[in-house]
Amino acid sequence: ELVFGAMMSGFNEKCYDGLSFFNTAHKVGDATYSNRSNKKLSRESYMEGRSSIMSIKGDKGKSLKLVPDLLVVPPALEETARLILEADQIDGTTNVLKGTAKLHVEPALAEHPEYWFLLCTNRFLKPFIYQLRKKIKFTSLTRDTDENVFMLDEYLYGADGRSNAGYGFWQMAYGSTGEVEAQAQG
């Protein structure tokens, strides 16, 4: 839940370079890169995001050799995403994008039904970081000798834990707000 919250907030929240995590002006050396779009999910916008991640170079001008492997969508985009990633053919032509990433449909993204994210998760470093500071511990007050049970006939249950999520490497993520139609290549 924390990671998906960070993902959705990435269009506004800043990462280590002082820019929003998803931004059109990330600097690496003399080059400027974008990992942000406003295009609706389509074959064309998916290819654009894939190309964006795969084209990023490090500060010495060499490819980071990143290949995105996970498409994250809200339930409203599941059908479109499945067509892009799983269909043998689309509109009578071979789907060359089949199998280029795994699909994760995330209910927590339902509040933003047009957002979609393409991530590179196959490396040790990740685009988002989940930090478990204190493992969740479940407790209960259910014994007959507990005051709440004896006096009020109430059984209490609780959980205590600490964790957080934040931004890792923007180079490994591409996000879109899905506001405008992508132009078909022709």
Question: Model features per residue range: what roles?
Answer:
Residues 5, 12, 22-23, 118, ...:
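Compositionally biased, low-structure terminal segments
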Residues 29-55, 69-70, 76-186:
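Sequence/fold signature of self-assembling virion shell proteins
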Residues 9-40:
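Intrinsically disordered, low-complexity charged/polar segments
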Residues 59, 64-68:
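Short gly/pro-enriched beta-turn/loop segments at secondary-structure junctions
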Residues 1-15, 71, 157-159:
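Long, contiguous amphipathic alpha-helices that act as assembly "spine/axial" helices in icosahedral shell
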